[in-house]
Protein backbone atom coordinates (compact mmCIF):
# COMPACT_ATOMS: atom_id res chain seq x y z
CA UNK A 1 0.00 0.00 0.00
CA UNK A 2 1.30 3.45 -0.93
CA UNK A 3 2.57 5.72 1.84
CA UNK A 4 0.98 9.05 2.68
CA UNK A 5 2.81 12.25 3.57
CA UNK A 6 1.64 14.27 6.61
CA UNK A 7 -0.11 16.58 4.11
CA UNK A 8 -2.31 13.88 2.55
CA UNK A 9 -5.48 15.14 4.23
CA UNK A 10 -4.73 18.70 3.09
CA UNK A 11 -4.47 17.52 -0.51
CA UNK A 12 -7.87 15.84 -0.39
CA UNK A 13 -9.40 18.94 1.24
CA UNK A 14 -7.96 21.01 -1.64
CA UNK A 15 -9.60 18.67 -4.18
CA UNK A 16 -6.47 16.90 -5.38
CA UNK A 17 -6.46 14.00 -7.78
CA UNK A 18 -4.12 11.59 -6.00
CA UNK A 19 -1.85 9.08 -7.75
CA UNK A 20 0.74 6.52 -6.66
CA UNK A 21 4.17 8.08 -7.28
CA UNK A 22 7.00 5.63 -6.49
CA UNK A 23 5.07 4.23 -3.53
CA UNK A 24 3.69 7.56 -2.27
CA UNK A 25 0.16 8.87 -2.71
CA UNK A 26 0.80 12.31 -4.18
CA UNK A 27 -1.35 15.00 -5.85
CA UNK A 28 -1.23 14.97 -9.66
CA UNK A 29 -3.22 18.21 -9.83
CA UNK A 30 -5.96 20.10 -8.00
CA UNK A 31 -8.22 20.62 -11.00
CA UNK A 32 -6.00 22.18 -13.66
CA UNK A 33 -2.35 21.36 -14.20
CA UNK A 34 -2.07 24.26 -16.68
CA UNK A 35 -3.44 26.80 -14.18
CA UNK A 36 -1.05 25.54 -11.53
CA UNK A 37 1.88 25.83 -13.95
CA UNK A 38 1.01 29.44 -14.83
CA UNK A 39 0.53 30.34 -11.16
CA UNK A 40 4.15 29.36 -10.43
CA UNK A 41 5.45 31.28 -13.44
CA UNK A 42 3.47 34.44 -12.63
CA UNK A 43 2.79 34.46 -8.86
CA UNK A 44 3.32 31.70 -6.29
CA UNK A 45 2.55 28.00 -6.07
CA UNK A 46 3.52 25.26 -3.63
CA UNK A 47 4.31 21.58 -3.78
CA UNK A 48 4.36 18.85 -1.16
CA UNK A 49 7.85 17.34 -1.50
CA UNK A 50 7.76 15.45 1.79
CA UNK A 51 8.31 12.20 -0.10
CA UNK A 52 11.93 13.23 -0.67
CA UNK A 53 14.50 11.97 1.82
CA UNK A 54 16.55 14.24 4.09
CA UNK A 55 19.72 12.59 5.41
CA UNK A 56 21.90 14.21 8.08
CA UNK A 57 25.56 13.19 8.23
CA UNK A 58 27.71 13.85 11.30
CA UNK A 59 31.29 13.07 12.18
CA UNK A 60 34.76 14.61 12.05
CA UNK A 61 35.47 13.03 8.63
CA UNK A 62 32.16 13.98 6.96
CA UNK A 63 33.72 16.39 4.46
CA UNK A 64 36.40 13.82 3.57
CA UNK A 65 33.68 11.17 3.06
CA UNK A 66 31.56 13.39 0.79
CA UNK A 67 34.61 14.34 -1.30
CA UNK A 68 34.90 10.60 -2.03
CA UNK A 69 31.16 9.86 -2.39
CA UNK A 70 30.17 12.69 -4.76
CA UNK A 71 31.36 13.81 -8.20
CA UNK A 72 31.09 17.46 -7.22
CA UNK A 73 33.49 18.66 -4.53
CA UNK A 74 32.22 19.75 -1.12
CA UNK A 75 35.58 21.48 -0.60
CA UNK A 76 33.81 24.36 -2.38
CA UNK A 77 31.43 24.65 0.59
CA UNK A 78 33.07 26.99 3.09
CA UNK A 79 30.17 29.18 4.24
CA UNK A 80 27.64 27.64 6.63
CA UNK A 81 24.36 26.90 4.83
CA UNK A 82 25.87 26.81 1.34
CA UNK A 83 24.61 23.98 -0.89
CA UNK A 84 25.67 22.33 -4.11
CA UNK A 85 24.12 19.94 -6.63
CA UNK A 86 25.93 16.70 -7.45
CA UNK A 87 25.63 13.28 -8.94
CA UNK A 88 26.35 10.28 -6.73
CA UNK A 89 27.98 7.81 -9.11
CA UNK A 90 28.78 4.12 -9.27
CA UNK A 91 32.20 2.77 -10.24
CA UNK A 92 31.28 2.74 -13.95
CA UNK A 93 30.34 6.43 -13.85
CA UNK A 94 26.57 5.86 -13.94
CA UNK A 95 24.30 8.07 -11.82
CA UNK A 96 22.92 6.37 -8.71
CA UNK A 97 21.10 9.61 -7.87
CA UNK A 98 21.32 13.37 -8.18
CA UNK A 99 21.09 15.25 -4.91
CA UNK A 100 21.69 18.47 -3.01
CA UNK A 101 24.25 18.64 -0.19
CA UNK A 102 24.27 21.38 2.47
CA UNK A 103 27.26 22.29 4.63
CA UNK A 104 26.61 23.50 8.19
CA UNK A 105 29.76 22.73 10.19
CA UNK A 106 32.83 20.57 9.63
CA UNK A 107 31.08 17.66 11.30
CA UNK A 108 27.53 18.27 10.01
CA UNK A 109 26.29 18.07 6.42
CA UNK A 110 22.80 17.37 5.03
CA UNK A 111 21.75 15.53 1.86
CA UNK A 112 18.37 15.75 0.13
CA UNK A 113 17.85 12.75 -2.16
CA UNK A 114 15.05 11.55 -4.44
CA UNK A 115 12.13 9.43 -3.23
CA UNK A 116 12.27 6.84 -6.02
CA UNK A 117 15.90 6.03 -5.15
CA UNK A 118 15.58 6.18 -1.36
CA UNK A 119 16.42 2.58 -0.42
CA UNK A 120 19.36 2.12 -2.80
CA UNK A 121 20.70 5.58 -1.87
CA UNK A 122 20.62 4.86 1.86
CA UNK A 123 22.23 1.46 1.32
CA UNK A 124 25.00 2.97 -0.85
CA UNK A 125 25.66 5.88 1.52
CA UNK A 126 25.70 3.61 4.60
CA UNK A 127 28.05 1.12 2.94
CA UNK A 128 30.60 3.77 1.98
CA UNK A 129 30.25 5.85 5.16
CA UNK A 130 31.25 3.02 7.48
CA UNK A 131 35.07 3.37 7.15
CA UNK A 132 34.75 7.11 7.83
CA UNK A 133 32.80 6.65 11.08
CA UNK A 134 29.85 8.75 9.91
CA UNK A 135 26.64 8.93 11.94
CA UNK A 136 23.67 8.82 9.53
CA UNK A 137 20.24 10.14 10.54
CA UNK A 138 17.29 9.83 8.15
CA UNK A 139 14.97 12.73 8.96
CA UNK A 140 11.59 11.05 8.55
CA UNK A 141 10.38 13.43 11.27
CA UNK A 142 10.42 16.29 8.74
CA UNK A 143 7.99 17.30 5.99
CA UNK A 144 9.01 19.54 3.12
CA UNK A 145 7.04 22.18 1.20
CA UNK A 146 8.42 23.92 -1.91
CA UNK A 147 7.02 27.43 -2.40
CA UNK A 148 7.95 28.63 -5.90
CA UNK A 149 7.33 31.63 -8.14
CA UNK A 150 8.18 35.34 -8.47
CA UNK A 151 6.09 36.20 -5.38
CA UNK A 152 6.80 32.98 -3.46
CA UNK A 153 9.44 34.29 -1.08
CA UNK A 154 7.40 37.36 -0.14
CA UNK A 155 4.25 35.29 0.47
CA UNK A 156 6.09 32.63 2.47
CA UNK A 157 7.81 35.30 4.58
CA UNK A 158 4.42 36.46 5.90
CA UNK A 159 4.38 33.19 7.88
CA UNK A 160 7.88 33.65 9.31
CA UNK A 161 8.59 35.22 12.69
CA UNK A 162 11.00 38.17 12.95
CA UNK A 163 14.03 35.95 13.57
CA UNK A 164 13.19 33.77 10.55
CA UNK A 165 12.69 36.79 8.30
CA UNK A 166 16.04 38.14 9.45
CA UNK A 167 17.71 34.75 8.86
CA UNK A 168 16.66 34.63 5.19
CA UNK A 169 17.12 38.31 4.41
CA UNK A 170 19.43 38.67 1.40
CA UNK A 171 20.03 34.90 1.25
CA UNK A 172 21.42 33.95 -2.16
CA UNK A 173 20.28 30.93 -4.21
CA UNK A 174 21.47 27.52 -3.03
CA UNK A 175 21.69 28.34 0.65
CA UNK A 176 19.80 26.91 3.60
CA UNK A 177 19.34 28.09 7.17
CA UNK A 178 17.78 26.56 10.27
CA UNK A 179 15.61 29.29 11.79
CA UNK A 180 13.56 28.11 14.75
CA UNK A 181 11.67 24.98 13.69
CA UNK A 182 11.96 25.79 9.96
CA UNK A 183 14.82 24.80 7.68
CA UNK A 184 14.50 27.34 4.85
CA UNK A 185 16.47 26.83 1.62
CA UNK A 186 16.65 28.93 -1.55
CA UNK A 187 16.41 25.90 -3.81
CA UNK A 188 13.73 24.55 -6.13
CA UNK A 189 12.82 22.55 -9.20
CA UNK A 190 10.94 25.09 -11.31
CA UNK A 191 13.39 27.69 -12.63
CA UNK A 192 11.74 30.30 -10.40
CA UNK A 193 12.82 31.88 -7.12
CA UNK A 194 11.38 30.40 -3.96
CA UNK A 195 12.01 28.40 -0.82
CA UNK A 196 12.06 24.72 0.04
CA UNK A 197 10.98 24.57 3.68
CA UNK A 198 11.49 21.54 5.94
CA UNK A 199 9.55 21.49 9.20
CA UNK A 200 8.34 18.99 11.82
CA UNK A 201 5.64 16.65 10.50
CA UNK A 202 3.15 17.75 13.15
CA UNK A 203 3.40 21.39 12.04
CA UNK A 204 3.18 20.78 8.28
CA UNK A 205 -0.62 20.83 7.89
CA UNK A 206 -1.03 24.17 9.71
CA UNK A 207 1.79 25.71 7.67
CA UNK A 208 0.21 24.44 4.42
CA UNK A 209 -3.19 25.88 5.37
CA UNK A 210 -1.61 29.22 6.25
CA UNK A 211 0.11 29.33 2.85
CA UNK A 212 -3.23 28.62 1.13
CA UNK A 213 -4.82 31.44 3.11
CA UNK A 214 -1.87 33.66 2.13
CA UNK A 215 -2.64 33.20 -1.56
CA UNK A 216 -0.21 30.41 -2.48
CA UNK A 217 -1.80 27.92 -4.91
CA UNK A 218 -1.37 24.18 -4.27
CA UNK A 219 0.28 22.49 -7.26
CA UNK A 220 0.70 18.83 -8.18
CA UNK A 221 3.19 16.54 -9.85
CA UNK A 222 1.90 17.42 -13.33
CA UNK A 223 2.83 21.10 -13.06
CA UNK A 224 6.07 20.20 -11.26
CA UNK A 225 7.10 18.15 -14.30
CA UNK A 226 6.25 20.75 -16.96
CA UNK A 227 7.95 23.48 -14.90
CA UNK A 228 11.17 21.52 -14.39
CA UNK A 229 11.25 20.51 -18.06
CA UNK A 230 10.87 24.13 -19.19
CA UNK A 231 13.74 24.99 -16.83
CA UNK A 232 15.88 22.21 -18.34
CA UNK A 233 16.18 20.30 -15.07
CA UNK A 234 16.83 16.58 -15.16
CA UNK A 235 14.48 13.94 -13.76
CA UNK A 236 16.15 10.84 -12.36
CA UNK A 237 15.17 7.73 -14.31
CA UNK A 238 14.62 9.72 -17.50
CA UNK A 239 17.61 11.98 -18.21
CA UNK A 240 19.96 9.79 -16.20
CA UNK A 241 20.21 6.52 -14.32
CA UNK A 242 22.85 3.99 -13.28
CA UNK A 243 23.73 3.24 -16.91
CA UNK A 244 24.07 6.87 -18.04
CA UNK A 245 27.09 9.09 -17.48
CA UNK A 246 26.58 12.62 -16.14
CA UNK A 247 28.55 13.67 -19.23
CA UNK A 248 25.65 12.41 -21.36
CA UNK A 249 23.04 14.11 -19.14
CA UNK A 250 24.17 17.76 -19.24
CA UNK A 251 25.72 17.28 -15.79
CA UNK A 252 29.34 17.81 -16.81
CA UNK A 253 29.31 21.07 -14.84
CA UNK A 254 28.65 19.10 -11.64
CA UNK A 255 31.89 17.11 -11.95
CA UNK A 256 34.83 18.66 -10.09
CA UNK A 257 37.89 17.42 -12.00
CA UNK A 258 40.28 19.54 -9.95
CA UNK A 259 42.20 18.83 -7.83
CA UNK A 260 43.39 15.99 -10.06
CA UNK A 261 44.39 13.86 -7.08
CA UNK A 262 40.89 13.79 -5.52
CA UNK A 263 39.66 10.21 -5.69
CA UNK A 264 35.87 10.01 -6.00
CA UNK A 265 33.68 7.04 -6.93
CA UNK A 266 33.36 6.82 -10.72
CA UNK A 267 36.27 9.15 -11.52
CA UNK A 268 38.31 6.61 -13.47
CA UNK A 269 35.36 5.68 -15.70
CA UNK A 270 34.47 9.35 -16.28
CA UNK A 271 38.01 10.17 -17.38
CA UNK A 272 37.81 7.46 -20.05
CA UNK A 273 34.39 8.72 -21.15
CA UNK A 274 35.65 12.30 -21.30
CA UNK A 275 38.54 11.23 -23.52
CA UNK A 276 36.45 9.13 -25.92
CA UNK A 277 33.29 11.25 -25.87
CA UNK A 278 29.71 10.41 -24.94
CA UNK A 279 26.25 11.20 -26.18
CA UNK A 280 24.89 14.56 -25.09
CA UNK A 281 21.62 16.03 -23.85
CA UNK A 282 20.01 18.67 -26.06
CA UNK A 283 16.76 20.58 -26.15
CA UNK A 284 14.16 20.14 -28.91
CA UNK A 285 11.47 22.63 -29.89
CA UNK A 286 8.53 21.80 -32.18
CA UNK A 287 6.31 24.75 -33.05
CA UNK A 288 4.04 22.70 -35.33
CA UNK A 289 0.96 20.95 -33.96
CA UNK A 290 1.70 17.83 -31.93
CA UNK A 291 3.48 16.86 -28.72
CA UNK A 292 6.98 15.47 -28.29
CA UNK A 293 6.77 12.47 -25.95
CA UNK A 294 9.26 10.40 -23.95
CA UNK A 295 11.08 7.66 -25.88
CA UNK A 296 10.30 8.93 -29.37
CA UNK A 297 13.29 8.52 -31.73
CA UNK A 298 15.26 11.59 -32.85
CA UNK A 299 17.00 11.27 -36.22
CA UNK A 300 19.55 13.49 -37.91
CA UNK A 301 22.27 13.45 -40.56
CA UNK A 302 25.67 14.80 -39.54
CA UNK A 303 27.99 17.03 -41.57
CA UNK A 304 29.62 13.96 -43.14
CA UNK A 305 26.27 12.63 -44.33
CA UNK A 306 26.05 9.86 -41.71
CA UNK A 307 22.66 9.11 -40.18
CA UNK A 308 22.24 8.97 -36.40
CA UNK A 309 19.45 8.29 -33.95
CA UNK A 310 18.88 9.47 -30.39
CA UNK A 311 15.91 9.37 -28.04
CA UNK A 312 13.63 11.82 -26.26
CA UNK A 313 14.11 11.45 -22.50
CA UNK A 314 11.37 13.93 -21.47
CA UNK A 315 8.83 15.66 -23.68
CA UNK A 316 5.70 17.73 -23.11
CA UNK A 317 3.59 20.66 -24.21
CA UNK A 318 5.04 23.83 -22.69
CA UNK A 319 2.28 25.95 -21.11
CA UNK A 320 4.59 28.98 -20.94
CA UNK A 321 5.71 28.82 -24.57
CA UNK A 322 2.58 27.40 -26.16
CA UNK A 323 4.33 24.65 -28.11
CA UNK A 324 6.06 21.32 -27.51
CA UNK A 325 9.53 20.96 -25.99
CA UNK A 326 11.73 18.00 -25.10
CA UNK A 327 15.06 16.90 -23.73
CA UNK A 328 16.81 14.31 -25.89
CA UNK A 329 19.95 12.21 -25.56
CA UNK A 330 21.66 12.14 -28.95
CA UNK A 331 25.03 11.29 -30.51
CA UNK A 332 27.46 14.17 -30.90
CA UNK A 333 27.43 15.88 -34.26
CA UNK A 334 23.80 16.93 -34.23
CA UNK A 335 23.17 20.21 -36.04
CA UNK A 336 20.46 22.83 -35.63
CA UNK A 337 17.57 20.62 -36.80
CA UNK A 338 16.44 17.01 -36.51
CA UNK A 339 13.44 14.80 -37.28
CA UNK A 340 11.14 13.17 -34.72
CA UNK A 341 8.80 10.38 -35.77
CA UNK A 342 5.34 11.00 -34.28
CA UNK A 343 3.04 8.13 -35.26
CA UNK A 344 3.46 7.99 -39.05
CA UNK A 345 4.62 11.59 -39.49
CA UNK A 346 8.19 12.87 -39.64
CA UNK A 347 8.16 16.17 -37.75
CA UNK A 348 10.97 18.73 -38.01
CA UNK A 349 12.34 20.02 -34.70
CA UNK A 350 14.78 22.76 -33.79
CA UNK A 351 17.77 21.71 -31.67
CA UNK A 352 18.53 24.05 -28.76
CA UNK A 353 20.44 24.16 -25.51
CA UNK A 354 18.64 22.01 -22.90
CA UNK A 355 16.82 24.91 -21.22
CA UNK A 356 13.68 26.66 -22.44
CA UNK A 357 12.43 29.10 -19.77
CA UNK A 358 14.25 31.14 -17.12
CA UNK A 359 12.45 33.47 -14.69
CA UNK A 360 9.25 33.17 -16.71
CA UNK A 361 10.87 34.18 -20.01
CA UNK A 362 11.59 32.09 -23.11
CA UNK A 363 15.26 31.34 -23.79
CA UNK A 364 14.85 28.59 -26.42
UniProtKB/Swiss-Prot annotation:
Protein name (record): Aminomethyltransferase
Catalytic activity: N(6)-[(R)-S(8)-aminomethyldihydrolipoyl]-L-lysyl-[protein] + (6S)-5,6,7,8-tetrahydrofolate = N(6)-[(R)-dihydrolipoyl]-L-lysyl-[protein] + (6R)-5,10-methylene-5,6,7,8-tetrahydrofolate + NH4(+)
Gene: gcvT
Keywords from the named record: Aminotransferase, Transferase
Similarity comment: Belongs to the GcvT family.
Keyword Nucleotide-binding part of the UniProt annotation: no
Subunit structure comment from the entry: The glycine cleavage system is composed of four proteins: P, T, L and H.
BP GO terms, sorted: glycine decarboxylation via glycine cleavage system
GO molecular function: aminomethyltransferase activity; transaminase activity
Any one annotated GO CC term: cytosol
Protein purpose: The glycine cleavage system catalyzes the degradation of glycine.
Pfam families: GCV_T (PF01571), GCV_T_C (PF08669)
Keyword Transferase: yes
Taxonomic source organism: Escherichia coli O157:H7
EC number: 2.1.2.10
Amino acid sequence: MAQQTPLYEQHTLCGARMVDFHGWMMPLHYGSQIDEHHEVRTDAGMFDVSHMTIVDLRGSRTREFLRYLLANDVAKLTKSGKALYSGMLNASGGVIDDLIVYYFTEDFFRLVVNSATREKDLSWITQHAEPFGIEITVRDDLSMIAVQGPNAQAKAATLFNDAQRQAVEGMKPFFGVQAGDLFIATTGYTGEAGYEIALPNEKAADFWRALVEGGVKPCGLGARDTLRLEAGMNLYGQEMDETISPLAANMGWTIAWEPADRDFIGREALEVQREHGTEKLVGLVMTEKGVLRNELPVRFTDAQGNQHEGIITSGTFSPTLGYSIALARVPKGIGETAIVQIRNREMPVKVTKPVFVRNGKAVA
